[in-house]
Amino acid sequence: MSRTVSPSSGTSYGLARVCRIWRMARTTLYRHRQPPLARQRRGPIGPLPDPMLTAEIRAILATSPFHGEGHRKVWARLRMMGIRTSLRRVLRLMREHGLLAPSRTGAPRGPRNHDGTIIPETIDTLWGTDMTTAWTAEGQAAVFVAVDHHSAECVGLHASRQGTRFEALEPLRQGVREHFGGFAKGIASGLSVRHDHGSQYMSRAFQDELRFLGIASSPAFVRAPEGNGCAERFIRTLKENLLWVRHFETIEELRQALLAFRESYNSTWLIARHGFQTPAAIRHKQLPCAALAA
């Protein structure tokens, strides 16, 4: 096109004008006009070219009595055979030809796009629970929390010396007694609990307790803490306002401080997504609707 003669001026259009009209960079055009360069490995070739060295690597893997040997041991066996080459070259060739030792890639996972929401429309629909730790003069203590995903209300807080599956149930028991009026079989039907895949939450005792209360287990995706984000966010608030700023002599003192923090948090902490209302105000506003739905 640049060599085409203009009928009005009698001169060729020129490369600069054509690139400007077509909105194309001249550097890109010059680059594609050059013949492609043959790709060659940089540096010295070594004692063997790549095809022959790959054949030696395959022979080592075939004759080795062990399975799963990686590129480092293959490189060492090459040196024992008198073939001296670099470790990176052995790694590159084994990677290109699929000869590396199998790694723990895990099971194939589905879509991981976090394009949904973990915030339900009403209270007492989805609670989240998680565990953190705190230090006292008696040693480390396990701190368990339970949070309503809709209102961000803390429905349960507990501290214990041991972070067992039985201690992990205490925040949920607190919330069920207060918001469902007791502790009986099927009393919390319609509630789901979001938790991670920790040993406490996946234990038979924990899951049996949920089924007894009528609670549906809702585990988050593996290695996806966003699914339990409400409990994670509350733990951050708890650390910044209590666990990291106060010293506790005993675990019992910590437990009592957690109960006091729960009352203060629910009555004074402001939730931005609800128009800067407190969790207690959100619950009070929805109580008539919840009672009618029940």
Regions found by a protein language model. Name each.
Residues C19, Y30-L126, A224-P225, T278-P288:
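Basic, flexible linker segments flanking DNA-binding modules
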Residues R211-I215, T237-A294:
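C-terminal domain-tail junction helix/linker
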Residues M52, M80, R84-V147, E153, ...:
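Mobile-element integrase/transposase regions
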Residues G46, H195-H197, S203-L210, S217-E240, ...:
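RNase H-like two-metal-ion nuclease catalytic core shared by retroviral integrases
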Residues M1-Y13, T54, R58-P65:
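Short, amphipathic alpha-helical "recognition" segments used to contact nucleic acids or chromatin
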Residues V18-W22, L29, I57, V74, ...:
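Mobile genetic element proteins and their domesticated derivatives, centered on retroelements
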Residues S12-G14, E69, T85, E249:
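Residue-level signal for the short linker/turn that defines the boundary of a DNA-recognition helix
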Residues S2-R33:
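Structured, non-catalytic alpha/beta "coupling" segments that mediate domain-domain communication
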